[in-house]
């Protein structure tokens, strides 16, 4: 990339509470935050700004649960698409919104960009394959949107977050 900015700092939180504290501090001090997964996106959403903190989520790389009966996988945002597919392929499943960068790209980046690939025509993009997320807002508030069922009452806040490129 021709864009070469160094952020104020790069942080590697290891849990949601650390992310919450970092965001609350940055919000209070009016410091910009750029979330980053694997950095494979082409829109520039994960490029640091010189007056920002780069929030690297690469340590959030665990598959939490695989529920074959309900066709649901719970993962942290740093898990790669390929890791999800490899974890479920023995039962004939795969992660359908498969961008060409699936070897390196992470599910967190997919959510931020609403990514998709060749199977998206049939199965939809990330937003069509996502049941829920845990988000941390700039004030440090931790919230869960969605759940283990596709349809829920009220506004589609999950759809609003998906594809927001970390801006919300």
Description of each model-found segment:
Residues 62-168:
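FAD-binding subdomain of flavoenzyme oxidoreductases
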Residues 1-60:
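Glycine-rich N-terminal segment of FAD-binding domains in flavoprotein oxidoreductases
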């Amino acid at each position: 990339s021709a864009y070469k900015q160094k952020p104020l700092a790069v942080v590697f939180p290891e849990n949601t509470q650390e992310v919450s504290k970092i965001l609350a501090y940055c919000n209070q001090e009016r410091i910009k935050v750029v979330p980053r997964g694997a950095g494979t996106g082409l829109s520039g959403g994960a490029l640091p700004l010189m007056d920002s903190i780069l929030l690297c989520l690469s340590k959030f790389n665990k598959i939490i649960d695989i529920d074959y009966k309900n066709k649901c996988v719970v993962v942290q945002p740093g898990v790669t698409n390929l890791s999800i597919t490899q974890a479920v392929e023995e039962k004939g499943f795969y992660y359908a919104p498969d961008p060409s960068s699936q070897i390196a790209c992470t599910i967190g980046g997919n959510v931020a960009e609403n990514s998709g690939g060749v199977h998206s025509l049939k199965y939809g993009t990330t937003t069509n394959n996502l049941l829920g997320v845990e988000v941390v807002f700039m004030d440090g508030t931790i919230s869960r949107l969605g759940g283990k069922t596709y349809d829920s009452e009220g506004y589609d806040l999950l759809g609003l977050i998906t594809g927001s490129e970390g801006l919300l």
